[in-house]
């Protein structure tokens, strides 16, 4: 019995070796091809009914989001361009107003300066005329004083030298000398 068990075990072992890999055994190929086709059809239906619609929905949503974002960006760009244009116009208007205010202020200051200069010139002219008249008075007074001192000195010199002083001749001599 031991021999029979050994032989049966040996035959089973040799039978397994004779068969080889079941994937390469042509006896099993129709069954393997059937299950391959069933698996591929199942994967195809799973992809077409579940996965691809979800992927398509996600892609469509992304495309819509991108399109909306691009449209919003374009709209914001247009608004930014309009805002920049309005800003530049307001800035130009403000500059023009500032230049006008500067021109008005400059004109007012020039007018005030002209009035003040004219007033100062008038005051200076009046003081200058007054000073000229004073100088003329002082000069006339000094000339009169010099003439009198010269007459007195001439009379004193003539008297000191022992001569007779004639007032008319002294006046004529002093007047001739004063003229030049």
From Swiss-Prot:
Taxonomic classification: Bacteria, Pseudomonadati, Pseudomonadota, Alphaproteobacteria, Rhodobacterales
Concerning Gene3D superfamilies, the annotation shows: 6.10.250.1580
Assembly and oligomerization: F-type ATPases have 2 components, F(1) - the catalytic core - and F(0) - the membrane proton channel. F(1) has five subunits: alpha(3), beta(3), gamma(1), delta(1), epsilon(1). F(0) has three main subunits: a(1), b(2) and c(10-14). The alpha and beta chains form an alternating ring which encloses part of the gamma chain. F(1) is attached to F(0) by a central stalk formed by the gamma and epsilon chains, while a peripheral stalk is formed by the delta and b chains.
Q: Which family does it belong to?
A: Belongs to the ATPase B chain family.
Membrane association type: Single-pass membrane protein
Query: Is Acetylation one of the keywords UniProt gives this record?
Result: no
This protein's source sits in the domain of life called Bacteria
Residue ranges crossing the lipid bilayer per the database entry: 33-53
What organism does the UniProt record list as the source?
Answer: Cereibacter sphaeroides (strain ATCC 17025 / ATH 2.4.3) (Rhodobacter sphaeroides)
Record protein name field: ATP synthase subunit b 2
Instruction: Mention one GO molecular function.
Output: proton-transporting ATPase activity, rotational mechanism
InterPro entries per the UniProt record, alphabetical:
ATP_synth_b/b'su_bac/chlpt, ATP_synthase_B_chain
UniProt keywords, alphabetically:
ATP synthesis, Cell inner membrane, Cell membrane, CF(0), Hydrogen ion transport, Ion transport, Membrane, Transmembrane, Transmembrane helix, Transport
Q: What does this protein do?
A: F(1)F(0) ATP synthase produces ATP from ADP in the presence of a proton or sodium gradient. F-type ATPases consist of two structural domains, F(1) containing the extramembraneous catalytic core and F(0) containing the membrane proton channel, linked together by a central stalk and a peripheral stalk. During catalysis, ATP synthesis in the catalytic domain of F(1) is coupled via a rotary mechanism of the central stalk subunits to proton translocation.
Pfam families according to UniProt: ATP-synt_B (PF00430)
- Which locations, inside or outside the cell, does it occupy? Cell inner membrane
The GO cellular component terms are: plasma membrane; proton-transporting ATP synthase complex
The family database entries (HAMAP family) matched by this protein are listed as: ATP_synth_b_bprime
């Amino acid at each position: 019995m031991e021999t029979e068990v050994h032989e049966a075990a040996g035959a089973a072992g040799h039978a397994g070796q004779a068969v080889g890999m079941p994937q390469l055994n042509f006896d099993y190929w129709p069954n393997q091809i059937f299950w391959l086709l069933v698996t591929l059809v199942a994967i195809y239906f799973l992809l077409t009914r579940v996965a691809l619609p979800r992927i398509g929905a996600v892609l469509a949503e992304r495309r819509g989001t991108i399109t909306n974002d691009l449209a919003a960006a374009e709209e914001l760009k247009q608004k930014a361009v309009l805002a920049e244009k309005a800003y530049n116009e307001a800035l130009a208007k403000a500059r023009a107003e500032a230049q006008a205010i500067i021109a008005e202020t400059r004109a007012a200051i020039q007018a005030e300066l002209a009035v003040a200069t004219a007033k100062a010139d008038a005051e200076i002219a009046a003081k200058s005329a007054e000073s000229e008249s004073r100088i003329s008075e002082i000069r006339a007074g000094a000339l009169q004083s010099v003439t009198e001192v010269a007459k007195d000195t001439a009379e004193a010199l003539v008297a000191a030298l022992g001569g007779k002083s004639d007032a008319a001749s002294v006046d004529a001599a002093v007047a001739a000398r004063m003229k030049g």
